[in-house]
Each structure stands twice: as C-alpha cells, then as structure tokens.
C-alpha cells in the first residue's frame, strides 16, 4: 500500500510554475475544480487562470518566464516542458480574453521556435524578450 501511494505521487504532473502575486478575484480552473489563485499555488499544464474585474495574477514558470494577467483575463496553459540541464523545452498558452504581459525565460532564449501564444484571432511566436498581448473581450 505504501508503494502504491508513492507510485501515484510519481504520476502526478509536476507544476509548470507558481503564483507569485495575486490580487482581487483570481482563480485556477483545474479538471473542473475552481481553486483560488493564492500566492504559492501551483500552476500546471491544462490549467485555466481567470481574473475578475478587480483581479490580476503573476505567475513564474520553472524556466523563469514571467506571466502577468490583468483584470478580466482568461489564460490557458496548453503546453509546458522544461529541461533544467539543457534549458530546452516548449511553452504554449492561449489568451482567451484580457491582457497578458510576458517576460520570456530560458526556453525562449534556447528554443524561441518552441514558444507560442494564441489569442482568438492570432498566433504569436516569440522572438523578443518582453511583450504584452491584448485579446480584448475575446471569445471563450
């Protein structure tokens, strides 16, 4: 029984990042559950991060990418993989509505072709280090 529970822990997906700042209404939607996006909360692949009219959330991914979602924003973390030794990896996120400020991390420096962000109307590849995405009211 002890072996089985440790096996389950090993199968749990590693966090892609951590909530570093949070204010107002901000939550993480994970597998149908709505969790508060409190400072220190894990952010995982397939999570949806949402903020209300008074909300904002700052996330640091494991490769040191910084994501800052403004009020009335919806962000889906579609893909994230990062090798801490080679700094190779992949990052894809969708900004469904609102704004997202990004300061790219190690993946974008090592493999910029593997970093992309989508909005309801456009797909963006990363070639710089800092940018802001404004998806407006977006489409859910």
Please place each PLM-identified region on the residue numbering.
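Flexible, surface-exposed loop/linker segments and immediately adjacent secondary-structure boundaries
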Residues: 7-140
